[in-house]
Regions:
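N-terminal membrane-targeting hydrophobic helices
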Residues: 1-154, 158-174
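A broad, structure-centric signal for solvent-exposed, well-ordered loop/edge residues
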Residues: 92-93, 179, 210-211
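Exposed beta-strand-loop-beta-strand "reactive/processing" segments of non-cytosolic proteins
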Residues: 168-196
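Short, solvent-exposed aromatic-acidic interface loops
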Residues: 197-201
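Single conserved hydrophobic/aromatic residue that forms the stacking wall/gate
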Residues: 202-211
Length: 211
């Protein structure tokens, strides 16, 4: 699972000439659902070649490989950089910008679940239960991040209106390794405005909170 889930990011090692091309190519074809569907049967076949005793589990291998690949792209979609999931039909980078690219609050519950599964391998039911708990906690964190992003977006919109700031585009994303403090960048006719907002502010935001 770890190896398959890492495959889409191996495109960073392709020699494309310069950093701009490298950045544009990353999270493109290698992260597109269509190409993942094409690659899945081949990868499942290779796994069964390596583990011939599991040939009778063909459907499970195909499902496992496809889930490992697709969830990789979906997770990348939660970051600010966007992922071209729908190539070759659309090159629009899909991104919800709700989680920083490195966030231990998401990663640690998953690691806890994996470690628990191995530690309690003599008690498989307990290991599986703890693994599911870790996965559930990390998934709830992603759901929370989407809610926090929506809330901050509404706060930013009100604050912009209160300050009579007109923006053509707004970028809202969490600061490193948390989903509490958010950074806001807005594009105006004369330049940019920037600010921060914390979800721990329970009172109604005043104009000085951002901008």
């Amino acid at each position: 699972g770890v190896i398959i889930g890492t495959l889409p990011d191996l495109d960073v090692y392709l020699p494309l000439g310069n950093a701009v091309k490298q950045f544009a190519f990353h999270r493109a074809e290698s992260h597109a659902f269509f190409y993942m569907l094409l690659a899945t049967p081949l990868l499942a076949w290779l796994i069964m070649k390596i583990h011939p005793k599991t040939k009778d589990r063909k459907i499970r291998w195909v499902a496992a490989v496809l889930l490992a690949l697709i969830t990789h792209s979906l997770l990348d979609g939660f970051t600010v950089y966007g992922t071209q999931m729908f190539l070759p039909f659309s090159n629009y980078p899909v991104g919800w910008s709700s989680v920083f690219i490195i966030d231990p609050l998401y990663t640690f519950p998953i690691l806890f679940g994996v470690l628990a599964f191995f530690i309690f391998r003599k008690k498989p039911k307990l290991g599986i239960r703890l693994n599911r708990i870790g996965l559930a906690v990390s998934s709830l964190y992603l759901i929370w991040s989407l809610g926090a992003n929506a809330y901050v977006s509404s706060v930013v919109a009100r604050s912009m209106d209160n300050q009579n700031i007109t923006v053509s585009q707004t970028l809202i994303g969490p600061t490193p390794m948390n989903t509490v403090l958010w950074r806001v960048v807005g594009m105006t006719d004369s330049g940019f405005v920037e600010g921060y907002y914390s979800c721990l502010l329970y009172t109604s935001p005043s104009p000085r909170d951002i901008g």
